[in-house]
Amino acid sequence: MGSVRVAIVGVGNCAASLVQGVEFYKDADPESRVPGLMHVQFGEYHVRDIEFVAAFDVDAKKVGLDLSEAIGASENNTIKICDVPDAGVTVQRGHTLDGLGKYYRMTIEESEQAPVDIVQVLKDKQVDVLVCYLPVGSEEAAKYYAQCAIDAKVAFVNALPVFIAGTKEWADKFTEAGVPIVGDDIKSQVGATITHRVMAKLFEDRGVVLDRTMQLNVGGNMDFKNMLERERLESKKISKTQAVTSQIRDRDLGEDNVHIGPSDFVAWLDDRKWAYVRLEGRAFGDVPLNLEYKLEVWDSPNSAGVIIDALRAAKIAKDRGIGGPVLSASSYFMKSPPVQYFDDEARDNVEKFIKGEAER
C-alpha cells in the first residue's frame, strides 16, 4: 500500500490541526468507530498513510522551521491535541501575491527570503496532493497555486472560498491536464454551514416554509482578523450563502431574507468560533415557527476532520487517472462544489466513489 504525499500551502491553524491529526490517529483501528473521523480507512488509504513532504508560507516566523515547529509558531492559536515529532520538512518561502491582507500585514512580518520554485519543489518531492490553506480573499494567490498543481501534475484540494473547481474555466483546465481537484471552500465536520443546511432542509422536508434566515459568526483566529477587511469577503459570503440556499430547490428566498457571513473578531476566543443561527418559517395554518441556536467549535480541528478525507479522495482520483473536479468528494466536503447535492445524497456518492462504483 502506498502513501499520500502531501504539500501544504499556508501553515496556519488548519494545517496545525491536520498535521497533529495524522499523528493522533496513526494507530486508529480501521474496524472501529473512532471519534472525529468519518473514515479511518478511506479506500486503500489509512490516516497514517498521509505523509507531509513539503510546506510553504510567507510568515518570517514560520519560513525555515521544521513543519512540526511551524504549526505552533507566530499567530497560530488552535488547541493542541498531541505532540508531533520532527517532520523532516522545512517550511519554504511561498509566493505572496494577494495572500496578505491589511490585517495580516499589521500582525505578521513577511519573510525576506526569495520565493522558491513551487512547481519544481512539487516535482522534486513527488507530491501527490497540494492542499491550499491560504487566507480568505487570496484570489490571485490561490489560482497561482492551482496552476502550479496543474503544471506539476499534482492533485489539488482547495480549502478556501476562491472559486476554482466550481468554474468552467478552471474545471476544464484540470480536466484537460488530467489532474484531479476537490473544491471549493472546506465544509467543516459539524460547523455552521452543515448544521444550517440540515436545518433549512428539515424545515422544507417537514412542510415548514422557510421565509428568512441568518448566520452570524465570531472567532479569535487570524482567519477572523483577516476577514475584518470586508473587501476580501465577497467570495466567502457567496460561498457560505449558496451552501445553505442550495437546499431550497423550488424558490429564491431573496437577498434581503438571507444574511450569512463572518461578523467580528474576538481575540480571546482564540481558534474557537461561535455561530449564531436563526431560521424563521411558517408552519401549519401559516403559524410562525422559529428556530435559533448557537454552535461553539474549535474551528481548525473541525476543518481537519474533513480535509483528512478530501486528501485521500484526491489521491484515489489521481491513482485512477481522473482529471477535473471530483464531484462526489467536492459536494460532500466543500461549501461551493461544481454541483450541489443534498448531504445524504452526497455522502452516498462518496461511498460509491471509494468503492469504484462512481467514476468521480
Spell out what each predicted region is.
Residues G10-A16, L134-E140, L160-G166, K187-T193, ...:
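Gly/Ser/Thr-rich loops at beta-strand to alpha-helix junctions
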Residues V127, K153-V154, V179, V208:
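Short glycine/serine/threonine/alanine-rich loop segments
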Residues K173-I186, G207, D211:
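Rossmann-fold dehydrogenase core element
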Residues V9, R48-E51, K62, E69-N76, ...:
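Active-site-lining helix/loop region of Rossmann-like oxidoreductase modules
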Residues N302-R360:
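NAD(P)-dependent Rossmann-like dehydrogenase/reductase catalytic/cofactor-binding core
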Residues V136-D151, A159-P180:
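Rossmann-fold NAD(P)-binding glycine/threonine-rich loop
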Residues M1-Y145, L233-I238, A275, F284:
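N-terminal glycine-/serine-/threonine-rich beta1-alpha1-beta2 phosphate-ribose binding loop
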